[in-house]
Amino acid sequence: MKICVLQPDYSTTKVDYQYYDPPRQLAHLWPDAQIDNVFLNKLTTYRQLKELGKKGYDIFVNLCEGYLEWEVPGVDVYYSMELLNLPYTGPGTKLYDVPKELMKYVAYCQGVKIPAYIVIESMDDVKKAAQKLNFPVFVKPEKAGDSLGVDRHSLVYNEEQLASKVSGIIEEYGPLLAEEYIAGREFTVLVAGNAENEKTCTVFRPVEYLFPEGYEFKTYSLKTSELHPDCNVPCRDKYLDRELRKAAEKIFLGFGGAGYARMDFRVNDKNEIHFLEVNFTCSVFYTDGYEGSADFVLKFDPIGQSGFLKHIVAEGIARHQRKMKPFVIKGNAISGFGIYANRDLRAGEFIFSGEEKAQRLVTLRHVEKNWSEDDKETFRRYAYPISKEVFLIWDNDPTEWAPQNHSCDPNSAYNGLNVVTLRPIAKGEELTLDYATFLDKNMQPFHCLCGAPNCRGLIMGMPNNSVTEREARLKKVRVPRQR
């Protein structure tokens, strides 16, 4: 295994976080692997990654967690790796910096309790927050993590204190989130996606933070300059252990979670669990007194830092492999374009995974009423009938197009919304479909020149040939014919 560990070069910034983020050494966690450390400069991130992409690394372990406001590599690392199609650990651009209001919404939809809250975008919102929320109220930035902007004055007991706290940080950190304070115990839970099944995750042993004297909540200093390692203890309450894991799993999967994440929860005097927030770019792999919450989870969980590293590497590689297309587009303006296998394919392998994927839908009525004649002709050639009146059409993003040609002797076919191979296919062979098997009477007929021994000549769609009709036939359920 050849691994490149990406860490931030702080030479471009004066942000104080650099003093609490020492270089992390991972080689001892996986002695059999080749582990190289590279420090990314904010000014040259893309160029550095482009060169690193030529060195044959199996995976990039990304430990760059800079905020958008910092002169430190952050989401741009994921953006560059996605452009360069490199395998990586962590969430990618989609979940890099999730707003707290979205966190609350996802948790709520997953059936996990959340504190009542108000988003404060200006001083005008202070009075509304004071009227709708029960004091005491906790005030924090709506986006930043690591308790940035949080100090001893973040817990307020009346409107005057709320206004004072908001006015002090809204210019730098706004918008803000004001939420009803949940007095009680605080727990952190670490979650990681699984390599073998993207719909599952592993939840590690929760850790409770026992606040040092004089503190009721975590501030920026408690997470950076004033660490208290003895305050982190494993959860020994079997009920809370089980329920915290269940809540964390629901939220992670609710986000379509990828990589790993750390979540904070509060438990009140009624033993009710309330979700606070999630960090998909949580710090990890620290030693020598710099350990963060995730490291304490790994200290108390049997997997340890070594096992966790291997877990997230396997998940990152598997995730990258799943998104790799098994074909390339070839062609020119003279002979046209087609798609060709870029590796040997087994029978039954996916060429496209349309199931559970966001795709463009349109009604026939909408097309007939609003589309130009040229667009209607394209529709008749390529629209995929979901039902008699609803069709799936091509993506707005041309990089997602796949000009798969017709053959009367095809080597792939639709299975529901997926396209799968019908037989083993050699690398370099064109991937074809029989258009008549998945298009209906709206299809534009054409003369076939595929050259197959069984070539039918004129190709036409079949009546009542929609996904709905075919799925019903598979279930042996008779659907009344629409007239």
Explain the meaning of each model-derived region:
Residues 1-87, 93, 97-98, 121-129, ...:
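ATP-binding N-terminal substructure of ATP-dependent carboxylate-amine bond-forming enzymes
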